[in-house]
């Protein structure tokens, strides 16, 4: 296992030390952001709805910041898991290094929430001294040597043969699932996907039916409702493998995942009994009907309305397309 990686002389030991230190700094910055947003949206210790509406950019930014910091935490745990197993190769070291370099820079300089929205720490009420305290020696080391052109170029060289890094699964079953779906894609999807695209064809129903038999649509649905009950990680692994072959196939299972979770968490017992087994089996294929003219996927701005009329609903509005 190489000790020095890419252009800068950072040993494996130094990389882990810097990442652990930087994660602590990120946690402190997150605490300052949480305190800042609380000051913007709270009155007398409680969230004020009017203030929350007014400061939704800051509140939204706090969610992003929390996610970024948790991402750093999980990346470090991934690297440590591989190191303990003796599988922390040059590629995985570079991936960890690039991830920390990029996220630490964004946490200090701005998170791109969209093309026209960049969140700065000050937008969440974070004082300048908290940002200055965040920029420790280890944070600056990773910011300046992490996600650099030489690091990215070396990653590109290492993944050219199809090895995209060890995912570090802590469950052997996930590796088996990954292999199973990679074989399925190599046999049933990859050889045909480009022609489907060129001919603007729907994914053949035979492929969808085989995916249903493999359990794609019920991965996270509990066994009680006819699913596999395997959890979010399995769903991510399967989606990644299907998407590797063809993005259209990769998106099929995610709609079922979203619909099943919404019904499981908020549905009545009758709705669960009716829909969950059928979603898990692939008998029902949910779709996401979001996009509207002049709206995109801004769910807060949707104009379509459903009004109860006896035992049914009257739906009025315009949709541009749906996503399956």
Where are these regions (language model features)?
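Flavin-dependent oxidoreductase catalytic core characteristic
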Residues: 1-225, 229-232, 236, 241-243, ...
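Glycine-rich, Trp-frequent "lid" loop and neighboring beta-strands that shape
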Residues: 169, 227-228, 247, 270-324
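Glycine- and other small-residue-rich loops at beta-strand/loop junctions that grip anionic moieties
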Residues: 196, 200, 264, 291
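Residue-level "edge-of-site" marker
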Residues: 224, 255, 292
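Conserved protein kinase catalytic domain
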Residues: 239, 260-263, 276
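N-terminal glycine-rich flavin-associated loop
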Residues: 250-270, 296
């Amino acid at each position: 296992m190489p000790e020095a990686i890419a252009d800068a002389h950072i040993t494996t030991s130094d990389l882990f030390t810097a990442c652990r230190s930087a994660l602590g700094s990120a946690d402190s910055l997150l605490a300052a952001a949480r305190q800042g947003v609380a000051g913007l949206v709270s009155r007398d210790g409680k969230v004020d709805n009017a203030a929350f509406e007014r400061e939704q950019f800051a509140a939204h930014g706090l969610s992003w910041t929390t996610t970024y910091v948790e991402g750093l935490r999980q990346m470090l745990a991934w690297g440590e898991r591989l190191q303990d197993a003796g599988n922390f190769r040059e590629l995985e070291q570079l991936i960890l290094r690039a991830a920390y370099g990029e996220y630490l820079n964004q946490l200090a300089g701005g998170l791109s929430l969209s093309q026209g929205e960049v969140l700065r720490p000050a937008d969440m009420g974070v004082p300048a001294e908290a940002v200055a305290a965040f920029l420790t020696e280890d944070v600056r080391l990773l910011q300046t040597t992490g996600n650099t052109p030489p690091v990215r170029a070396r990653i590109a060289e290492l993944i050219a043969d199809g090895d995209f890094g060890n995912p570090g699964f802590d469950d052997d079953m996930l590796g088996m699932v990954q292999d199973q779906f990679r074989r399925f894609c190599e046999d049933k999807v990859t050889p045909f996907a480009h022609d489907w695209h060129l001919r603007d064809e729907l994914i053949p129903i035979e492929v969808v039916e085989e995916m249903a038999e493999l359990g794609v649509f019920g991965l996270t649905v509990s066994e009680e409702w006819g699913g596999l009950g395997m959890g979010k990680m399995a769903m991510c692994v399967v989606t990644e493998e299907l998407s590797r072959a063809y993005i259209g196939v990769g998106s099929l299972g995610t709609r079922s995942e979203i619909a099943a979770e919404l019904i499981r968490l908020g549905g009545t017992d009758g709705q669960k009994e009716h829909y969950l087994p059928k979603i898990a089996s692939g008998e029902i294929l949910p779709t996401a009907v979001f996009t509207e003219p002049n709206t995109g996927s801004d769910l807060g701005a949707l104009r379509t309305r459903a009004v109860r009329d006896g035992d049914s609903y009257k739906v009025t509005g315009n949709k541009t397309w749906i996503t399956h």
